[in-house]
Amino acid sequence: MCIRDRPGTVTDFEIPKKYGLRQTIADTLGIGGIMRGLRTIPVLLDVCRDMEELCPDAHLLNYVNPMAMNCWALSRATPIRTIGLCHSVQGTAEQLARDIGVPVADINYLCAGINHMAFYLRFERRTADGVEDLYPLIRRVVAEGRVPDWNRTRYDLFTRFGYFVTESSEHLSEYVPWYIKRDRPDLIARYNIPLDEYISRCESQIAAWDVIRQLLEDEATALAVERTHEYGSTIIHSLETGQPRVVYGNVANDHLIDNLPQGACVEVPCLVDRNGIQPTRIGALPPQLAALMMTNVNVQSLTVEAALTGRREHIYQAAMLDPHTAAELDPEQIYALVDDLIAAHGDWLPAFSDGDAAIAHRAAEHNGQANG
């Protein structure tokens, strides 16, 4: 689900670009993630209100980004049982398995954090002699210069924080303040960062759609039905049959991770069976990982607050605290950018689209504080 579809996505890229703020995906954090969250949360709440009336005991399996913002808002505003599902944990495990030359079926791992910024706390395999830690093999990939060209950002973060992050390099590069700089094209080249990547994907998908549709409709070229590593169908199967499975899900932090805020959306292993979806307690994360996550959690928290209360000032504050936005723009630029985006999205942000009145109120408030 993408609220306002391609026009909304293009707006989230093109207006920030006028301020010199470049993005890669813009669907999870950053100014693009904030705007996408503000457009999406009200629609998901409408879905949940329908569920409250029609199927109050059902589970909502959410695949929609910005995952953490969406699930956090739903956990606060509706009793519908929600789990957010992503493929970054199991997908990255498969990628690392290829990098180190170990079959993924032989690997066991424990991963925890927030969506798109969870880390493998353990990455290992059982051997005849016990358990082998596979992190030395990952470090060897770096030492031997075998880092894939498309994955340089994540491997760089790994060398500095000591654990490997789940989400892709193009995503990660816009969650932190270090890799995308408007006056540092050398960084873009060094880390092979695909700016405007989401727009490129949209254009490719649109261009290819007619061909894909013809292939799908032709029995000779129709896709074979095979299970992927996505969790949705297996969760439904376990809930209905009782067959136990462990999946990685995004749920409210109810004493699951000690050094992240209670109530925040966290990504942890969850046992699924006929008893429901049961998250696993992790305890405390390594302090450097929790500190890095908090730079993202702060933005998520204020965006959710804005979506649920309609208070425009929380949008400004979320943008000011966003690591990438704050590294590129000053406060006045950030305020102006937020105003421009809200105006451009118009009726898609009805709680905030009072336009000139809101801007005038903000200016008066700002002037009053300055004069005081």
Give, region by region, the residue ranges found by the protein language model.
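Short, small-residue-biased leader/transition segments that mark boundaries at the very start
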Residues: 1-3
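Sparse, context-dependent recognition of short Cys/His-centered cofactor- or disulfide-binding micro-motifs
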Residues: 6, 29, 59, 67, ...
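Glycine-centered flexibility sites
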Residues: 8, 30-33, 84, 242, ...
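Rossmann-fold NAD(P)-binding glycine/threonine-rich loop
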Residues: 8-76
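Conserved aromatic-histidine-acidic binding/catalytic patches
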Residues: 32-39, 58-62, 84, 220-223, ...
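Soluble or luminal CAZymes and related metallo-dependent hydrolases
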Residues: 39-43, 88, 227, 295
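Internal, well-ordered domain-core segments that constitute the primary functional module
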Residues: 47-118, 124
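Long, compositionally biased stretches enriched for glycine and/or charged residues
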Residues: 101-371
